[in-house]
C-alpha cells in the first residue's frame, strides 16, 4: 500500500494566508506596564499584532519606550508582509511608549495618514488608583 501524502498545511502548524490589504488602522494601547500594537484592515479584522512582552521583554522593561518601539516595528513588518502601506493610528492610554511606537511605525515603512488620541475619559466613573508613596 502506498504511503499517504499530505496536501496543504504542515502537520500541527497554522497555514499563513497572505492578505492583500493596502490600507488599515493601527491601534496602540500604551499602559503603564506594557504597550500593545494591533494592525487591522479597514473592517477591523486583525492582520498583525505585537506587544512588549511578545517581543521578549519581561517585567519593568516592558514599559520602556524602547520596548514599544520594538513591538511597533514587529507588528509593522508583519503587516507589510500582507501588503499594508498606509495606516491611520489610534493611540490609547497614558504610557511612555506612545510617541515612540508611532515613530517606529513610520520608520518601518508604513505611511501614517492620521493620528487620533482615543484615550477613554471617565465621566466620574471608577475610582482612580491611589498615589504612590516613594
From Swiss-Prot:
Transmembrane segments: none annotated. GO terms for molecular function: rRNA binding; structural constituent of ribosome. Residues 113-122 have a biased composition (Polar residues). It holds the Pfam family Ribosomal_S11. One of its GO terms (biological process) is translation. Keywords: Ribonucleoprotein, Ribosomal protein, RNA-binding, rRNA-binding. GO terms for cellular component: ribonucleoprotein complex; ribosome. Residues 113-134 are annotated as: Disordered. PANTHER family: 40S RIBOSOMAL PROTEIN S14/30S RIBOSOMAL PROTEIN S11 (PTHR11759). Part of the 30S ribosomal subunit. Interacts with proteins S7 and S18. Binds to IF-3. Belongs to the universal ribosomal protein uS11 family. Located on the platform of the 30S subunit, it bridges several disparate RNA helices of the 16S rRNA. Forms part of the Shine-Dalgarno cleft in the 70S ribosome. This is Small ribosomal subunit protein uS11. It comes from Corynebacterium aurimucosum (strain ATCC 700975 / DSM 44827 / CIP 107346 / CN-1) (Corynebacterium nigricans). The gene is rpsK.
Amino acid at each position: 500500500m502506498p504511503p499517504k501524502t499530505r496536501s496543504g498545511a504542515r502537520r500541527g502548524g497554522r497555514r499563513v494566508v497572505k492578505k492583500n490589504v493596502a490600507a488599515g488602522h493601527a491601534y496602540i494601547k500604551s499602559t503603564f506596564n506594557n504597550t500593545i500594537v494591533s494592525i487591522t484592515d479597514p473592517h477591523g479584522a486583525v492582520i498583525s499584532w505585537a506587544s512588549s512582552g511578545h517581543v521578549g521583554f519581561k517585567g519593568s522593561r516592558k514599559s520602556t519606550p524602547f520596548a514599544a518601539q520594538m513591538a511597533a516595528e514587529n507588528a509593522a513588518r508583519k503587516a507589510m508582509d500582507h501588503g499594508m502601506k498606509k495606516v491611520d493610528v489610534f493611540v490609547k492610554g497614558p504610557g511612555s511608549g506612545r510617541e515612540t511606537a508611532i515613530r517606529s511605525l513610520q520608520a518601518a515603512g508604513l505611511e501614517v495618514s492620521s493620528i487620533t488620541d482615543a484615550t477613554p475619559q471617565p465621566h466620574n466613573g471608577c475610582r482612580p488608583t491611589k498615589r504612590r508613596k516613594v
